[in-house]
From Swiss-Prot:
Signal peptide: none annotated. InterPro entries: S04_transporter_CS, SLC26A/SulP_dom, SLC26A/SulP_fam, STAS_dom, STAS_dom_sf. Its main location: membrane. This is Sulfate permease 2. Residues 1-25 are annotated as: Disordered. It is found in: Membrane. The gene is SUL2. Belongs to the SLC26A/SulP transporter (TC 2.A.53) family. It holds the Pfam family Sulfate_transp.
Amino acid sequence: MSREGYPNFEEVEIPDFQETNNTVPDLDDLELEYDQYKNNENNDTFNDKDLESNSVAKHNAVNSSKGVKGSKIDYFNPSDVSLYDNSVSQFEETTVSLKEYYDHSIRSHLTVKGACSYLKSVFPIINWLPHYNFSWFTADLIAGITIGCVLVPQSMSYAQVATLPAQYGLYSSFIGAYSYSFFATSKDVCIGPVAVMSLQTAKVIADVTAKYPDGDSAITGPVIATTLALLCGIISAAVGFLRLGFLVELISLNAVAGFMTGSAFNILWGQVPALMGYNSLVNTRAATYKVVIETLKHLPDTKLDAVFGLIPLFLLYVWKWWCGTYGPRLNDRYNSKNPRLHKIIKWTYFYAQASRNGIIIIVFTCIGWAITRGKSKSERPISILGSVPSGLKEVGVFHVPPGLMSKLGPNLPASIIVLLLEHIAISKSFGRINDYKVVPDQELIAIGVSNLLGTFFNAYPATGSFSRSALKAKCNVRTPLSGLFSGSCVLLALYCLTGAFFYIPKATLSAVIIHAVSDLLASYQTTWNFWKMNPLDFICFIVTVLITVFASIEDGIYFAMCWSCAMLILKVAFPAGKFLGRVEVAEVTDAYVRPDSDVVSYVSENNNGISTLEDGGEDDKESSTKYVTNSSKKIETNVQTKGFDSPSSSISQPRIKYHTKWIPFDHKYTRELNPDVQILPPPDGVLVYRLSESYTYLNCSRHYNIITEEVKKVTRRGQLIRHRKKSDRPWNDPGPWEAPAFLKNLKFWKKRENDPESMENAPSTSVDVERDDRPLLKILCLDFSQVAQTDATALQSLVDLRKAINQYADRQVEFHFVGIISPWVKRGLISRGFGTLNEEYSDESIVAGHTSYHVARVPQGEENPEKYSVYTASGTNLPFFHIDIPDFAKWDI
């Protein structure tokens, strides 16, 4: 039985060898024939081949003094750029140095000008205060007073959430509003007590108080809250001054929305007992689900306070609906023809909605005064706020009790995260809406300084409020200076209205809290958008809410933070590396989009891949183009062309020039290209691989495995393992198992070999070991256009990959790199011998080097717009580094 010889590879004829009878050929003979095959192949590799020539310049093969053949590709049409003798000017590319990095990225920040710029950035008010005018003042005054009217009742309500007396909420409000004006980069954010931070403060007070079972008189709730503000302020300011605000970006928006929704749900149910009048019967510091259960159990214990809670809550929602939705809709419907009246009613609705909290509290405070005046605490039918000290009490340097800071340590990370994330998320959101830039580092400084100054007034932690910031933006505030007017309103209330605050019903404050906090609950549209944008974000959001509700707010915060970091690491550790194929694409401008979806195949196409419309004649103003649809029907279409005059008085024809684009093979899934387009594989012996993330120690092993598996799958060995002695084969790749001679002579083995069923059940190999038609790997092109950085571990993995592939291919495989965007990545690659041929890893006699350079053309000026200067785009000393993926189909491989 005769057997055919080796496959025809690179037009090399391999002598056939015959096998007679059924005996196994001698290994020495096979090795001799294989050596002859390799010699013929190598000799043919260095022979110059005839190259075709056409209107576009083709390759010019040049044999170097070392015997390495280089081929040069002309990427420009000769009508555009003329390259003499297909040559490029020499350009020696150097590697980046530490001095260059210092000059480029560091030097400018260490100068006197840089120091002045830094100091100026700490006080943004310096940039806009000289331009302050009366129009800005009027807008800021109106917005500031409006926010002040909202801030007073809200700050007292949130102090109740924090289990603190009402005056501490007022202290935090006025000092936060004052100090933020001088450090802010957002004109809309309002600093003060907020719901989530107040809840966290209450948790901290409860935890720290539990650590003092004997009841130290110096460790009170206000002292713990002020100490927490001190520590949060120091850390926030330090992070801002050191410009480490990017750390806040590690937690994603969906994670922030998750724990804010869970916290809002916690606050809402925590205020229901006070709303109904049985607050002392329910432990509102327990897990949320327990609070819900206990609240429902004690519904029969409802008191008269429910009247002062449920009615205000109902009125607040009706008020919001009428003034925010239905009233403006009626105004637009019936007053659109009277612009002046329409504007008056519009602003009336707006300010009525903004003042709803204050008006409700004033009304029910009057009722509370009427029914509780002159009665003792036990005789009062409802719970009222009680005594609120007038003015600023105990102003001065705050002294921290010994040992208190260490007790706060375990609660500090969660508190800082709540303090920073909510504020940064709010400020950046309004910055996008109102078209101004928010500097996160400076915002951290503003929060830190505000809380540090607050310790002189016994304030508790304050940060940005979403509801007040939204109201401030709707008031058309112009500068952060409006905070001065808001703070003045709070200060005025502290000195003039504390007597009236005594009669505020606690149930009414709970109604205000529930009404304000309900806006923090994520709507079903937000939840559904998370699912549509990314299911993983949806899962993070839901799980964070559940953990916050069924465990604690701290656990929800830590889970959200860990989830965000885990997703970041997993995306880097498991990159979506892709092997690429090629397709010819072209840009068609001002094209007519046909309503049908048939695929068009142009019949008239020249040799350069340029499709043109067929000219119907010199006098004919219409030219016809034939195309073929996917239903195999020829359709003739008349395309009207614009009659631009040309020197030959002929109609200019549209030209579509195609170029090679490299696309992943799984483009049907990635939607990078029309799924009906067939991706052509690279030429034989070429693999193109795109890395989708930075090439680091986290993912280098995965890339190594993906590439080696693909190499072994689509290419054959340089030295077939069947033609090697068994003793020379590696233990981890010994080849197919063959039965020993004594086993083949046994009767049952012969019967097994002749049994059709056993042949069907025998393991099959994807490649015929007798005849392997797969090509030899010659070029591995790595697309580094998305690789921002690399490290020593990854570079060593790349060296190991080169060694393994060279050993598999039995030759030096060329490693080409495309689109390197970092000079440090290029420096690392060069240090490990990449960028050109490396004779250290293989015998030069089996290397066929291919050189390809990109050139760039630059117009010489307006005087000679048709003349260009041509430069070499990449270093000629590094021929394996490219700006774009070469068109390997044009290479002489």
